[in-house]
Swiss-Prot record:
Biological classification of the source: Bacteria, Thermotogati, Deinococcota, Deinococci, Deinococcales
Signal peptide residues on this chain, from the entry's feature table: none
Protein's gene: rpmJ
InterPro entries on file: Ribosomal_bL36, Ribosomal_bL36_sp
Domain of life: Bacteria
Organism: Deinococcus deserti (strain DSM 17065 / CIP 109153 / LMG 22923 / VCD115)
Name the UniProt record assigns to this protein: Large ribosomal subunit protein bL36
Amino acid sequence: MKVRSSVKKMCDNCKVIRRHGRVLVICSNVKHKQRQG
C-alpha cells in the first residue's frame, strides 16, 4: 500500500474508489495499491 498525495491509475486494471472519505486505488497487481494520505 502506497500512501500518496495524488493517486493515479497505473494500469488498465486499476480502479479508483472512495471508501470512508478516502480515495483508494485497487488493482489485481498488489504493487499498484494506493491510498491518499
